[in-house]
Structure formats: C-alpha cells, structure tokens
Swiss-Prot record:
Species in which this protein is naturally found: Bos taurus
Compartments reported by the entry: Nucleus
Residue numbers spanned by region Disordered: 1-23
Domain remarks: In the N-terminus possesses a conserved domain OCA for bivalent binding to class II POU domain-containing transcription factors and to an octamer DNA motif.
Name the record gives this protein: POU domain class 2-associating factor 1
The entry's keywords: Activator, Nucleus, Transcription, Transcription regulation, Ubl conjugation
C-alpha cells in the first residue's frame, strides 16, 4: 500500500508591514557617546594647535654652548647679574663717522637770481568801470582820454554810436585822438531842395449829373395762377405720365 503524506495547505502571503525605518546594529546615541569620549580623551593627550595671524619670528642659532646646559661654578659667577662665561663677547661697535656737510648742487639756481618777465613793475590802467588793463609800462598806452568813450549816459545831441566790436585777443593797443572841432560847429548842409509846384487854379474835374435807370425785374409768375390756367385734361395726362414712369421703374427692377 502506498502511504501518501498529507500535503500542508498552501500558506497565504503575509500582509505587508508598514515601514519602520532602517535597523542599525548599534544605536546612534551610543555612537555619539563614544565619539565624545574619544574627543575628550584626545584633547587631554594632544593639545590643540592655535594658529595666530602674526608673522613668524626669525629663528636664531645659538653660538657656543648654552648657558643652561653648563654647570656654572660659584667662582664663575662673581656678582648677581654678571655675564655667563660661555657667552661670546660682542665686538666693539665701530666708531661713528660724522657725515660730511651737504655739498651744494652746482646746477641749482636760486629763483631770485632768475629774471622773470612777470616780476617787473606792473601798472593798472582803468579803461572803463568794468574793464581794467594790467601790465608793464610797455603795454599800457598813456593818453589824455580813455580809449572807450561809450560808457557815459547818452544825450540827445550826442551821435548814436554802435557797441564796440570785439577784436582778436592779440590786438595792437589803440590810441585816442581827440576831435579838434565839436559837432555843433560843423557846417550845415548846403543842399537846397526846390519848393513843390503850386496847385493848378480852378477845379480840374467837372461834375456832370448822370441818371442811371433802375433795372426792371420781370414779374414772377405765380404758380397758383399757372395751375389755375391749366385744364383738367392736362393735369390728368401729367399724372398718368408720372404713374407710368413709376410702374416701368418697378418692372425693370423686378425683372432684373
């Protein structure tokens, strides 16, 4: 007889579990505690190096044996503050030589010795209330009258003079020449004008009476009178003509 092993019923799939995070072998708190312990122990063993922003000091080499490593006997040190026997005596400083006095520079020339063209005597010559000439005597012109005379108030008898023209910058100095004869003594004009011819005696135009006929306007015919004069037959014919025209117009539009 064949014995059949009873088969186990098929296991149903387990329901999915919610996400509970990643399981760590060692908890995080323990790791942090260990890290802090290592940091504290390392700080006690190895001091932390402090970096200063100052420039590094120059290194000096010791000459001869150091004073601290030597065994100094009592006979060596005579007084407090005496020098150590191992130190090397410094050489005596060389005698300072006085500096020679400064030699004068041969090419230097005092500014007082140079004759500046602008160091000459300067003179001021007022030309007008708002203009003054400053310069040496060779530039100024000595005249009895000012160069510009158009600065006073104008009078009725004085001739009209235009404004002074602006000349170039480098203009020769002007010289004033006084007018020997005043304007009032000038001779008057000798040109004589002929008087106009007298008017012709008597009237030149003769007035003639002219009669202008008035235009006669044609009498406008009264439309009422024209309509009254027409007979009834003519009126009927005119109405028929107007009706036929309207009818023909409508027919042509409909046929189109």
């Amino acid at each position: 007889m064949l014995w059949q092993k009873p088969t186990a019923p098929e296991q149903a799939p387990a329901p999915p579990r919610p996400y509970q995070g990643v399981r760590v072998k060692e908890p995080v708190k323990e790791l942090l505690r260990r890290k802090r312990g290592h940091a504290s122990s390392g700080a006690s063993v190895t001091p932390t190096a402090v970096v200063l922003p100052h420039q590094p000091l120059a290194t000096y080499t010791t000459v001869g044996p150091s004073c601290l490593d030597m065994e100094v006997s009592a006979s060596t040190v005579t007084e407090e503050g005496a020098l150590c026997a191992g130190w090397l005596s410094q050489p005596a400083p060389a005698a300072l030589q006085p500096l020679a006095p400064w030699t004068p520079y041969t090419e230097y020339v005092s500014h007082e010795a140079v004759s500046c063209p602008y160091s000459a005597d300067m003179y001021v010559q007022p030309v007008c209330p708002s203009y003054t000439v400053v310069g040496p005597s060779s530039v100024l012109t000595y005249a009895s009258q000012p160069l510009i005379t158009n600065v006073t108030t104008r009078s009725a008898a004085a001739p009209t003079v235009g404004p002074p023209l602006e000349g170039p910058e480098h203009q020769a100095p002007l010289t004033y020449f006084p007018w020997p004869q005043p304007l009032s003594t000038l001779p008057t004009s000798t040109l004589q004008y002929q008087p106009p011819a007298p008017a012709l005696p008597g009237p030149q135009f003769v007035q003639l009476p002219i009669s202008i006929p008035e235009p006669v306007l044609p009498d406008a015919e009264d439309p009422r009178r024209a309509i009254g004069s027409l007979t009834i037959d003519k009126l009927l014919l005119e109405e028929e003509d107007s009706d036929t025209y309207a009818l023909n117009h409508t027919l042509s539009v409909e046929g189109f």
